[in-house]
A protein has these predicted regions:
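Extreme N-terminal starter segment of soluble prokaryotic enzymes
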Residues: 4-9
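Alpha/beta enzyme core
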Residues: 10, 15-63, 74-87, 96-206, ...
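A charged helix-plus-loop insertion that forms the helical arch/lid used to bind
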Residues: 68-73
Length: 223
C-alpha cells in the first residue's frame, strides 16, 4: 500500500544537470549521486514519506529521453532505493513516460509519474508533445511490469489542445488509458484545489496527488 490512510507527502528531487544535457558543466555522475543522497537524507529528516526523482535541470527537453539521461537516472534511482528502502520512490524522466517506466521497473521503484504527457496533446516550449499511453501500455505488457503509472492531467507548464474539461480528461486517463492514479496541478493554490475537487467528484476511488505548488506557507491548508 503506497498511501497512508490520512495523507502522504512527497518531496521532489531534481538533480543537477546530468552529463549530456545542455546545462551540464563539470559535475560527474558520482558528484551528482552524492548530492542527491545528501538531499534525500534531509528529506527523510523532515518527515516526508517519499520522493519523486525528476531530471528537471536537463531542460530543454523533447519527448524522447536521451540514452545517457536514462542511464544516469537509473543509477541515481538505484542509489536512492538502495540507501533508503523505506522511502516511497517515484520516477519521472522528462518528458518520457516510457523511459520512466523502464527506469522504475529496473530499480524496483514504487511508481512512475508521467508528465507531458499521458493522454491528449500539449503545446510546450519544445513544441507539441503527444500522449504516450499506448507506448506505455505496450511496455507494461511486454516486460510484465507491476509498477503503478500515475498520470498528470493538463500539465501546468503546457497548453492542452482541445479544451477538454479537467474531470473528463481525468476519467479518460483512468478508464481509457489505464492510469493507476493521477497528478493534478493548477497555476495557483486555489486552482489546484478546485481541480482536485472536480476530479475527485468524477473519480471517487482513484488515487489523486496534488502535483505541485506546495510551500511552507500553504502546506497546512493543502494537506
Amino acid at each position: 500500500m503506497m498511501f497512508k490512510p490520512d495523507c502522504t507527502a512527497f518531496a521532489m528531487i531534481q538533480p543537477s544537470a546530468l552529463p549530456g544535457s545542455y546545462r551540464h558543466e563539470d559535475k560527474t555522475i558520482d558528484d551528482i549521486v552524492a548530492e542527491v543522497l545528501e538531499e534525500t537524507q534531509m528529506i527523510v529528516d523532515n518527515g516526508f514519506d517519499g520522493v519523486i526523482l525528476q531530471n528537471m535541470n536537463d531542460m530543454p527537453i523533447k519527448q524522447n529521453a536521451a540514452p545517457e539521461a536514462i542511464a544516469y537516472m537509473t543509477r541515481i534511482a538505484y542509489e536512492i532505493k538502495h540507501q533508503y528502502p523505506q522511502l516511497i520512490l517515484g520516477v519521472l524522466v522528462n518528458w518520457d513516460g516510457v523511459a520512466s517506466l523502464a527506469v522504475a521497473d529496473a530499480v524496483h521503484a514504487d511508481f512512475v509519474r508521467v508528465e507531458h504527457l499521458f493522454t491528449g496533446a500539449n503545446v510546450t516550449s519544445a513544441g507539441i508533445l503527444e500522449g504516450q499511453c499506448v507506448e506505455i501500455a505496450a511496455l507494461r505488457k511486454r516486460i510484465r511490469s507491476k509498477v503503478p503509472v500515475y498520470a498528470d492531467i493538463q500539465e501546468v507548464h503546457g497548453i492542452p489542445l482541445g479544451g477538454k474539461p479537467i474531470d473528463d480528461a481525468a476519467w479518460e486517463a483512468v478508464h481509457e488509458a489505464f492510469a493507476d492514479g493521477l497528478f493534478v496541478s493548477g497555476k495557483s493554490k486555489e486552482e489546484s484545489l478546485e481541480m482536485i475537487h472536480a476530479v475527485r467528484k468524477k473519480l471517487p476511488d482513484t488515487p489523486v496527488i496534488l502535483g505541485g505548488g506546495a510551500n511552507g506557507e500553504n502546506i497546512e491548508e493543502l494537506l
